[in-house]
Regions:
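Tight coil/turn sites that cap or link beta-strands
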Residues: 26, 71, 86-90
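Exposed extracellular interaction/assembly regions and N-terminal maturation sites
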Residues: 1-70, 98-109
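Short edge-strand/loop segments of extracellular domains
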Residues: 69-78
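Beta-strand-rich interaction surfaces with strong enrichment in secreted/lumenal proteins
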Residues: 79-84
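Extracellular disulfide-bonded cysteine-rich modules/repeats
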Residues: 86-101
Length: 109
């Protein structure tokens, strides 16, 4: 019996020192885009149920965007990367399957 417990990794990305990062399943990413945009690449071969959470740590997605690179997997069946422009946004993507790809599990702004 699986209890569904995930080993979460908390990652703080500061755009003054890093502008690109590749996420792993379970990451909770606090993105500080004060200085520059940040691109986060989703896992290339995710398992069904894989999750990645994104949080606008400084409320600056409008001035310096967070770009989510889909890494060849669809996002809500789409073939475009996500560009986040809403200050204070926080959301979780969960991997569904090869057709739907990554889907929003939660999305707040």
């Amino acid at each position: 019996v699986s209890l569904g417990i995930r080993n979460k990794g908390y990652v703080t990305l500061n755009s003054s020192t890093i502008t690109a990062y590749t996420a792993v399943d379970g990451d909770q990413i606090f993105a500080n885009t004060t200085a520059n945009p940040i691109t986060v690449t989703l896992p290339a071969s995710p398992a069904v149920g894989s999750e990645v959470t994104f949080i606008d740590a400084r409320g600056t997605f409008n001035s310096n965007n967070l770009i989510v690179n889909r890494n060849s997997q669809p996002i809500n069946t789409g073939t475009s990367n996500l560009t986040l422009t809403t200050n204070g946004q926080a959301f979780t993507l969960v991997y569904v399957d090869a057709t739907r790809g990554w889907a929003f599990k939660t999305n707040t702004a």
